[in-house]
Amino acid sequence: MKYNNQIFLDEFKNKMLEINPQKVLFVCSKDYDRYGYRKALDEISIKSVSFTSFEPCPEVSSVENGIEAYKANECDFVVAVGGGSAIDTAKGIKFYSKLDFDILAVPTTAG
């Protein structure tokens, strides 16, 4: 089976255009640029910032730092790209911030 990343990125761009956020907080690993998500948002003129300061089995302090990044950068949407740690951190940011925003999770692992 061959995976076509461009097809997925096109679907991602279409979904983001539908959602139409002003600024996205990416919760992701430090090397997430290799997946092409930032470039995809740049192509459709949606601003984004990265939050990479979390560890496996995220601590509450990481979630608090994520909330700070979300607020300081005036984000209105979160995209979690990666495995369980990124997705769990994004869920923690939403839950503990008590702010009204949605999350889009993009798992990069399987199994």
Question: Which residues does each PLM region occupy?
Answer:
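ATP/NTP phosphate-donor binding region
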Residues: 1-77
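Glycine/threonine-rich beta-strand-loop-alpha-helix active-site module
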Residues: 60-111
